[in-house]
Amino acid sequence: VSDLGGPVVLCFGVVDEADIVKDFLEYHLGLGVEKFVATDVGSTDGTLDILCDYERSGHLHLTRFHDPSVRAENRDWLSAMAYRARDTYRASWCLFCDPDEFWVFPETDAPGYLAAAPSPVVIFPRYNMVPTCANDSGEVADFREFDLVARRPLEFFYDTQMVGKPGGVEALLWDYAPDIIRFVAPKVAARSDVIRAVVPGFHDVVAADPSIVRHRETRGYVGHFQARNAAQFANKARLVADYIAVNPPSVDRHSSRHWVRLAALYNHDMIYQEFARQILSPEEVAARLREGVIERDNRIAARLALIGGGA
C-alpha cells in the first residue's frame, strides 16, 4: 500500500474491449495503481475472460451486467464502483475512465502525483490518440505504437438535427474536420472519502462537500484510443447505435452529439468511411503538427513497449 494511506484504485466500465483491456490493466499497474473495480455491461468478445484472470489474482473486483443499452444511472453502477473501491479496497484515491483510456502523469507515477495533489478532486484533460500508418500500404499501425496526441483539439459541435434531412448524414460525415482531432470531455480522479456520486462519463464527481474546488491538470492527460482498427471501430459504433436506439437524446440527456452522429453513420453504412477519415495523411499530420493541434508524445507507447503487448 502506498504512502497515501490506501491503494490507488482505478474504476472502469467496459464492453467488448478484448484487444486493449490487458494492456490497459498492465499499463496502470505499472503506474502504481494497485486495484481495479470493473463493471462489464455485456461483453461477448473475450473481455470477460481477461477480466476474470485479474479477478482470480486478487487485483480486480468484477460486476457483470448483460445489456449495454441500459443507462448507467438506472443501475448507478458508476457510483457503486466508487463505494466498492472505498469499502472493499480501502482506496485512498480513485481514478475513473474507460479501458481505451490511459493516464499520463507528469514526471511521476499515480501515487507520487496524487500525494502532492492540491485538491481532493482533480480533472485531467482527455486527448485522442491519432492513428498512424504502419507503412506505405496505408495499413494502420498497432495502437501500441501511436505517438500522436491531439493536445490542442478543435472545438466544434455536430448539428445532429441533420440526421433526418436529405443528405444530412453525408454532411455529418464530410462537412467537419476528422473527429479524432475534436475536443473530448475530461476524466476525473478523486479521493475516495469525498465522493458522494460519480457523474456519467466519468467527467467529474459529486463531492460530499460542495465547496471543494477542482484542480485542473495542465501537463498530464488521459490518452484516448478511440480508433484502433476498422473492426474495433465498427463494433464500437454498433454498440453505440444499439444504445441510441433505446436511449435517444429525447430520453437520455447524456446521449452526446458525438454518439448520435456515430450511430447515424453506422446505420447508413458509412462507418468504414468514418474510420478512414481518422487516419491522417502524412500531409495532414505535418499540417496539424505545425498548427499545434497534434503533438508527438511517446510516453504511452514507451510504457506499452515495456509491457510487451497484451491481449
Regions from the PLM with identified roles:
Residues E34, S92, P120:
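Short acidic/polar active-site loop segments enriched in Thr and Asp
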Residues V41, A91, D98-F102:
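Short acidic donor-binding/metal-coordinating loop in glycosyltransferase active sites
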